[in-house]
């Protein structure tokens, strides 16, 4: 019994770390995307909010099943493949293509922790894939030119602000008139309050 409780505590701690990093990366990437869309594409506040709403829909669509990852959904619909910094694709990783089951007790604690460590590294590609898929679906951004261009612009803005979440959040509010992460947080709170 103590072993099972220890496994649960370790798993919960790893899950909390993953959620914390997800929130941080969402703030960084969404803010950079909003700034890029404002600076280079002339988007205003309302259009940015509309895209944020679409990304929530896409995120919830992906979360309904563990059979497809966000990078997989993006590639299947657009032909665009996002990769992690080490050049790995979602094709290479079991936890991104649902070929493992973490809930039936088949994973050991070290295996579970290793999976969570790898998932931490894959947060930016997953968040980016969600934004790109939303741009493709809602705004007709194609995979041949426009999606790669916005990826480059987002990366440039992240670099400009040194991936500083607070600086990006403030710049997003100053430049676009909305703090996207605060908007997203309020929509998530509303979603769970209604559920």
Predicted regions span which residues?
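Long, low-complexity interaction regions most often at the N-terminus
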Residues: 1-2, 7, 41, 59
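Amphipathic alpha-helical segments that form the core helices of the histone-fold
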Residues: 51-61, 150-159
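Helix-turn-helix-type domain boundary/helix-start signal
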Residues: 41, 139-140
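N-terminal interaction modules that seed assembly of large macromolecular complexes
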Residues: 36, 40-59
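Intrinsic disorder/low-complexity detector
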Residues: 3-35, 67-137, 165-195
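A structural feature that tracks compact, well-ordered secondary-structure segments
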Residues: 38, 137, 148-153
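Small-residue helix-packing motif on alpha-helices
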Residues: 48, 146-147
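Small-residue hinge/turn detector
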Residues: 44, 142-143
